[in-house]
């Protein structure tokens, strides 16, 4: 059921890491988790135009460090850093501890699953055909190095009466392989017909257990075309006989049946010299006697 489980949670112990990294006792765990959820909702609404990919929250002792991964870091920072200072003040007020905000730039937004999903939902809200938006995003991702991508849209697509689900895939998207680097993103488009959900899976190659070093794979398509029957035995080119049950070829080929049989001939007359063994045989002409008319009718 690899297509049902969340790709990030499925790979957390293997190749992925948590987006909230802190430790809390049982008494404070629920409170801190609720604070994280509210901070994420606030940042996504505040930085909607900044193309935010993901948010990492870390809490050292009596401090907080928030890292924002964005494809447009200039929008987050603002003119002369005014916006980011206001953002720090608001986050400090919400969390109640000093907050440090770091901005990381996303180099290739075309192969980031969350940014792809957000881009498609923005196009759907502008009444662009969903098939055109999905196929354009897939082409851009494959062109910039993704090994596979799958996009699924669900809802009242194009304003139809009955909701349906459509998905397209290009390349490989191995959902069951734990070492596969699968990036997953989800977004919702709020249209006049209702909400349309968009899910994106991007396959960016395999990773080792630590999640850092990629695995270099060779092209195995040529190896798959090898002869599955195994090596052929040493035999003449004209030998096409099938092997026996034990796998061995039968013995040497005997003479052909029609080669050793001689054509039927009449015995030579007495005193006639026999034909040479190697010479051509004399042709025998057979003549059918004509029957007299009286003999045919009977006397």
UniProtKB/Swiss-Prot annotation:
Keyword set, alphabetical order: Ribonucleoprotein, Ribosomal protein, RNA-binding, rRNA-binding
Record-annotated KH type-2 domain positions: 39-107
Domain of life, source organism: Bacteria
Gene3D superfamilies: 3.30.300.20, Ribosomal protein S3, C-terminal domain
One GO CC term on file: cytosolic small ribosomal subunit
PROSITE patterns assigned to the protein according to its UniProt record, in alphabetical order: KH_TYPE_2, RIBOSOMAL_S3
Residue ranges with Low complexity bias: 257-282
Annotated InterPro entries: KH_dom, KH_dom-like_a/b, KH_dom_type_2, KH_sf_prok-type, Ribosomal_S3_C_sf, Ribosomal_uS3_bac-typ, Ribosomal_uS3_C, Ribosomal_uS3_CS
GO MF, any single term: rRNA binding
Residue segments, region Disordered: 214-299
Basic and acidic residues biased stretches: 217-248
Assembly mode: Part of the 30S ribosomal subunit. Forms a tight complex with proteins S10 and S14.
Similarity-based family: Belongs to the universal ribosomal protein uS3 family.
Functional description taken from the UniProt entry: Binds the lower part of the 30S subunit head. Binds mRNA in the 70S ribosome, positioning it for translation.
Protein name: Small ribosomal subunit protein uS3
Annotated source species: Methylibium petroleiphilum (strain ATCC BAA-1232 / LMG 22953 / PM1)
């Amino acid at each position: 059921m690899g297509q049902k489980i969340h790709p990030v949670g499925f790979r957390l112990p293997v190749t992925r890491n948590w987006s909230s990294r802190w430790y809390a006792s049982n008494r404070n765990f629920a409170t801190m988790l609720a604070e994280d959820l509210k901070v994420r909702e606030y940042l996504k609404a505040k930085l909607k135009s900044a193309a935010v990919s993901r948010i990492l929250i870390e809490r050292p002792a009596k401090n907080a460090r928030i890292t924002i991964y964005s494809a447009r870091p200039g929008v987050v920072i603002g003119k002369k850093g005014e916006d980011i200072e206001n953002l720090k003040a608001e986050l400090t007020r919400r969390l109640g501890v000093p907050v440090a905000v770091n901005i990381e730039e996303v180099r290739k937004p075309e192969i980031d699953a969350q940014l792809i999903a957000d881009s498609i939902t923005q196009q759907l809200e502008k009444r662009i055909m969903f098939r055109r938006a999905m196929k354009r995003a897939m082409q851009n991702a494959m062109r910039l190095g993704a090994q596979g991508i799958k996009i699924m849209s669900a809802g009242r697509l194009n304003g139809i009466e009955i909701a349906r689900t459509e998905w397209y895939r290009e390349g490989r998207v191995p959902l069951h392989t734990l070492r596969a680097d699968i990036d997953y993103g989800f977004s919702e488009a709020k249209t006049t017909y209702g909400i349309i959900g968009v899910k994106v899976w991007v396959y960016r190659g395999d990773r080792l257990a630590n999640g850092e070093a990629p695995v270099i794979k060779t092209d195995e398509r040529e190896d798959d075309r090898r002869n599955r029957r195994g090596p052929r035995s040493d035999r003449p080119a004209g030998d096409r006989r099938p092997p026996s049950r034990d796998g061995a070829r039968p013995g040497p080929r005997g003479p052909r049946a029609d080669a050793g049989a001689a054509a039927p001939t009449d015995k030579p007359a007495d005193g006639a010299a026999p034909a040479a063994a190697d010479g051509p045989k004399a042709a025998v002409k057979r003549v059918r006697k004509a029957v007299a008319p009286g003999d045919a009718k009977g006397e």
